[in-house]
């Protein structure tokens, strides 16, 4: 499985990953089997040096803007920034490629982005919903949901070329 920091660009362009996840117990996104990563985190047996190293890595990733694919050059729309400044609740809904193994393994009820965005809106109808389709869908390398165009009726904003870090800030 691709690691949490993959590459500069998408795997569909045959750009090799710079990190991979190997786990003999299971994979982190499959709730049916506890992965080695989950066991390590659950045990919480970390030294002060481990925690300090993790904080330094996190700070460096945030400071340098590193993301999984390191793509997205546009800024958030000004109108969305104004909404954020006004204190209105904003929920980011990151899309997924619908034939991805994580969807099949982890989601019993939500099987596509339309169902995901709809469920989020139903849970919090007053929030501003920002939908970010998966980069492979945006690039045309993976098929969009059959209901992809219907998401427009539910989401308030759709951001495609914005860096994920800017969406989370």
PLM regions: where:
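Catalytic-core helical/loop segments in enzymes performing group transfer/polymerization on anionic/lipid-linked
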Residues: 1-169
């Amino acid at each position: 499985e691709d690691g949490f920091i993959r590459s500069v660009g998408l795997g569909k362009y045959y750009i090799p990953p710079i990190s991979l996840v190997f786990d003999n117990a299971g994979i982190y996104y499959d709730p049916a089997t506890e992965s080695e990563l989950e066991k390590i985190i659950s045990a919480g047996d970390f030294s002060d040096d481990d925690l300090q190293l993790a904080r330094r890595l996190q700070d460096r990733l945030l400071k340098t803007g590193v993301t999984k694919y390191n793509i997205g050059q546009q800024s958030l729309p000004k109108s969305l920034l104004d909404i954020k400044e006004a204190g209105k609740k904003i929920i980011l809904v990151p899309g997924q490629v619908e034939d991805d193994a994580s969807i099949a393994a982890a989601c019993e009820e939500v099987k596509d982005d339309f169902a995901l965005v709809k469920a989020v809106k139903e849970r919090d109808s007053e929030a501003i919903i920002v939908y970010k389709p998966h980069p492979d869908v945006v690039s045309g390398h993976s098929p969009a949901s059959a209901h992809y165009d219907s998401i427009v009726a539910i989401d308030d904003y759709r951001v495609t070329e914005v860096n994920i870090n800017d969406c989370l800030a």
